[in-house]
Swiss-Prot record:
Its cofactor is Zn(2+). Binds 1 Zn(2+) ion per subunit. Zn(2+) binds at residues 196, 238, 242. This is Peptide deformylase 1A, chloroplastic. Keywords: Chloroplast, Hydrolase, Metal-binding, Plastid, Protein biosynthesis, Transit peptide, Zinc. It catalyses: N-terminal N-formyl-L-methionyl-[peptide] + H2O = N-terminal L-methionyl-[peptide] + formate. It is found in: Plastid, Chloroplast stroma. The gene is PDF1A. The active site is at residue 239. GO terms for cellular component: chloroplast stroma; mitochondrion. The lineage of its organism: Eukaryota, Viridiplantae, Streptophyta, Embryophyta, Tracheophyta.
């Protein structure tokens, strides 16, 4: 099954495979012959903001800035005890062309196939292992229209209550959306710091709509619709952008891009104020 992936791509996706892309897929694609070991020292990435412009909470990854090995050993995110290395795809980093390629729709008849289900399983594993609240297929080197996301009470409990209230951040269970279509609702937007698993170590302010409607198919090929607001709406927009080949840095507010270490510093004069517009 692993060796058949190039033929799957030719038959289903009609995606041109450049040598560079094939090299990337060899390292990241769950349907190639070898799965790479995720580096145990990989540092979590997270999205943070508050109304005073000080960092604290994330969207693409849920983690604390000072992520200690002690908390990791305690299994504080997943309750699974000590984290162990697992064979799974690496997260593709900014600079790889796959992150700027429009993703391909998946034919309905292919959704239930072992190949597509394997991709979904790997995406969920990678997202939770990060740990994170969202992931798009291009982030593991696969230009297909699949996104996965979830936010839990446990994740949210690590953020101050006043901030999660300001974010309108509420838990939701695992969502797998195939061939999603996103519609922005209303005119209200908000400006928050945002980060990405594929842009390690950096953050920037991004304006997002407060309410969206997403339609698509679940992992069984059944039609679904998600009406989201607040933090969940932001996560959906972030992941949906990945399917169009867009990173948050392509939408960031000017002069707000910075390293994680500099998140405590105030924004430059003239930068937009954080919060609901």
């Amino acid at each position: 099954m692993m060796e058949r992936f190039p033929r799957l791509a030719q038959r289903v996706l009609s995606v041109p495979f450049t040598p560079k892309y094939l090299k990337s897929c060899k390292k990241t694609n769950p349907l190639t012959s070898h799965l790479m070991q995720l580096r145990g020292s990989q540092r979590p990435i997270f999205i943070q903001w508050n109304l005073q412009g000080r960092p604290s909470v994330c969207t693409d990854l849920i983690s604390k800035k000072n992520y200690s090995s002690a908390t990791a050993r305690a299994g504080w995110f997943l309750g699974l005890g000590e984290k162990k290395k697992q064979a799974m795809p690496d997260i593709v980093k900014a600079g790889d062309p796959v992150l700027h390629e429009p993703s391909q729709d998946i034919p309905l008849e292919e959704i239930g196939s072992e190949r597509i289900q394997k991709i979904i399983e790997e995406m969920v594993k990678v997202m939770r292992n990060a740990p994170g609240v969202g992931l798009a297929a291009p982030q593991i080197g696969i230009p297909l229209k699949i996104i996965v996301l979830e936010d839990t009470n446990e994740y949210i409990s690590y953020a101050p209550k006043d901030e999660t209230k300001a974010q309108d951040r509420r838990p939701f269970g695992l969502l797998v959306i195939i061939n999603p279509k996103l519609k922005k609702k209303g005119n209200k937007t908000a400006l928050f710091f945002e980060g990405c698993l594929s842009v390690d170590g950096f953050r920037a302010v991004v304006e997002r709509h407060l309410e969206v409607e997403v339609t698509g198919l679940d992992r069984n090929g059944k039609a679904i619709k998600v009406d989201a607001s607040g933090w969940q709406a932001r996560i959906l927009q972030h992941e949906y952008d990945h399917l169009d080949g867009t990173l948050y840095v392509d939408k960031m507010a000017p002069r707000t891009f910075r390293t994680v270490e500099n998140l405590d510093l105030p924004l430059a004069a003239g930068c937009p104020k954080l919060g609901v517009c």
